[in-house]
Amino acid sequence: MLLQGTHRIGRMAMLLALADENESPVLSIPKGWKYCTGKVGSMNSQKVVAAMETAAKSNQVIETDVYRETHALYHAIMEALYGVTRGQIQLADVLRTVGLRFAIVRGTPYDGKKEGEWVAVALYGTIGAPVKGSEHEAIGLGINHI
């Protein structure tokens, strides 16, 4: 089981999330891999999770009727949110809001087929008090097997 150097799923997700709208990251997405990107802003962590899950389903990154795919995506999203929120996913309860760009990538990062598919979720943006100018940059990455 070797992680393929050209198939670093987390790195690809991070580069996609970090790219501004007017720039495209120089990436070679491996054949058969799927991804989507988007933006979400809220004081409600449930809305953040729902927006990313909806994007993944709408862009056929995960199958809507397969529970294990939704479950894997959920855990990758939560892991990425832990990074953005420094381990405390509360937002509105502690008067914090986020404005994030996200990328969700699905693929096979290992050289052995038995290792199966994985999903990576990258988040980049700002977190802070719900007052313009009172935020700072934050980043998070979550990776889970499907």
UniProtKB/Swiss-Prot annotation:
Secretion signal span: none
Pfam families reported in the protein's UniProt record: HutP
InterPro entries: Regulatory_HutP, Regulatory_HutP_bacillales, Regulatory_HutP_sf
Domain of life: Bacteria
One BP annotation, GO: L-histidine metabolic process
Gene3D superfamilies per UniProt: Hut operon regulatory protein HutP
Key words, A-Z: Activator, Histidine metabolism, RNA-binding, Transcription, Transcription regulation
GO molecular function, a single term: mRNA binding
Subunit relationships: Homohexamer.
Family: Belongs to the HutP family.
UniProt function note: Antiterminator that binds to cis-acting regulatory sequences on the mRNA in the presence of histidine, thereby suppressing transcription termination and activating the hut operon for histidine utilization.
Matching HAMAP family: HutP (MF_00779)
Full protein name: Hut operon positive regulatory protein
Species assigned in the record: Bacillus cereus (strain ATCC 14579 / DSM 31 / CCUG 7414 / JCM 2152 / NBRC 15305 / NCIMB 9373 / NCTC 2599 / NRRL B-3711)
Gene it is expressed from: hutP
